[in-house]
Swiss-Prot record:
The keyword ATP-binding applies. It comes from Sclerotinia sclerotiorum (strain ATCC 18683 / 1980 / Ss-1) (White mold). Its EC number is 3.6.-.-. GO terms for cellular component: GET complex. GO terms for molecular function: ATP binding; ATP hydrolysis activity; guanyl-nucleotide exchange factor activity; identical protein binding; metal ion binding; protein folding chaperone; unfolded protein binding. This is ATPase get3. It is an enzyme of class 3 (hydrolase). ATPase required for the post-translational delivery of tail-anchored (TA) proteins to the endoplasmic reticulum. Recognizes and selectively binds the transmembrane domain of TA proteins in the cytosol. This complex then targets to the endoplasmic reticulum by membrane-bound receptors, where the tail-anchored protein is released for insertion. This process is regulated by ATP binding and hydrolysis. ATP binding drives the homodimer towards the closed dimer state, facilitating recognition of newly synthesized TA membrane proteins. ATP hydrolysis is required for insertion. Homodimer.
Length: 340
């Protein structure tokens, strides 16, 4: 395992993700950034490197686009599956908007005039923004906790959705309060509609519904506490050297800071390194622009490990190319002579 450093300044941190590999206590690692900056490639590559130094690693995609299957050329689903060619690296792709019916084990609605009451209660109880996503995320955490992986990496959705999970305990508490309020308000009416076993016409038991919600809320609250422990959790920001991406990265880092979530690594993808004497005007102009934003990144985040990754000629897909790309997260890329 290399710890090579190309920067010799004493005050400059190593431009690699080696610190993440060395921090054995880390259990949760999030990889996030603006859409199209290489989050999935980075998260897959980091997972490959971690698998070399950890007992077991799980890579989870919470991005609706689900690019893990494309990256590894292997189909993944909502159950953890071993990645071909690895003995201790698994992956899964989850739907962040799983249906309430599926999450609550909802039975099919019956027939008759009262058949719609269960559905109405459900619609009223779950008419809370984000409840589907919150419950889906809580179910995943519940499953992940029982699987006892040493390290879990999240390939997150684009920036706007990345930190939504931090609000999920509040969302689930609102849903619990709503169900409780409805059961009180409609108590007399429900008494005439409840089945012999105390269930609604569609088979859903209110007590079981509240118990399920409470269990999910406890799970997500417990794990959120771990997310705020820098010994257990870190967030890797991925960007490209352009204005909008830099702006999104700064906004994300500020938000992470407000939630007390550790972040000390930034991966800058798609860097151009024109050869000395290159007559490609577009390449040189773009490199000049990239250099400006790269200098801003290094100035703004002088206390971060800033990893510089080159724009490659070939698409990074498949185990072999991902492994090759992952090496540059640990051993800094050295541009050809004359490349700046």
């Amino acid at each position: 395992m290399s710890t090579a450093v190309i920067n010799t300044d004493d005050d400059q941190l190593e431009p690699t993700l080696q610190s993440i590999l060395d921090q054995k206590s880390l259990r949760w690692i999030f990889v996030g950034g603006k859409g199209g900056v290489g989050k999935t490639t980075t998260s897959c590559s980091l997972a490959i490197q971690l698998a070399k130094v950890r007992r077991s690693v799980l890579l989870i995609s919470t991005d609706p686009a689900h690019n893990l299957s494309d990256a590894f050329s292997q189909k993944f689903g909502k159950e953890a599956r071993l990645i071909n060619g690895f003995e201790n690296l698994s992956a899964m792709e989850i739907d962040p908007n799983g249906s309430i019916q599926e999450l609550m084990g909802q039975a099919e609605e019956g027939e008759g005039p009262a058949a719609g009451m269960g559905g109405m209660m459900q619609d009223l109880a779950f008419a809370i923004p984000g409840i589907d996503e919150a419950m889906s995320f809580a179910e995943v955490l519940k499953q992940v906790k029982s699987l006892s992986y040493e390290t879990i990496i999240f390939d997150t959705a684009p920036t706007g959705h990345t930190l939504r999970f931090l609000q999920f305990p509040t969302v689930l508490e609102k849903a619990l309060a709503k169900v409780s309020q409805l059961s009180t308000q409609f108590g007399p009416m429900l008494n005439g509609l409840l089945g012999a076993n105390g269930s609604l016409p569609n088979g859903q038991n209110l007590g079981e519904m509240m118990e399920k919600l409470e269990g999910l809320r406890e799970t997500i609250s417990e794990v959120n506490g771990q997310f705020k422990d820098e010994n257990l959790t870190t967030f890797v920001c991925v960007c490209i050297p352009e204005f909008l991406s830099l702006y999104e990265t700064e906004r994300m880092i500020q938000e992470l800071s407000s939630y007390h979530i550790d972040t000390h690594c930034i991966v800058v993808n798609q860097l151009l390194f024109p050869k000395k004497g290159s007559d490609c005007d577009q390449c040189n102009a773009r490199r000049k622009m990239q250099k400006k934003y790269l200098e801003q990144i290094e100035e703004l985040y002088d206390e971060f490990n800033v990893v510089k990754m080159p724009l490659l000629v070939e698409e990074v897909r498949g185990k072999e190319r991902l492994e090759k790309f992952s090496e540059m997260l640990i051993t800094p890329y050295v541009p050809p002579a004359g490349g700046l």
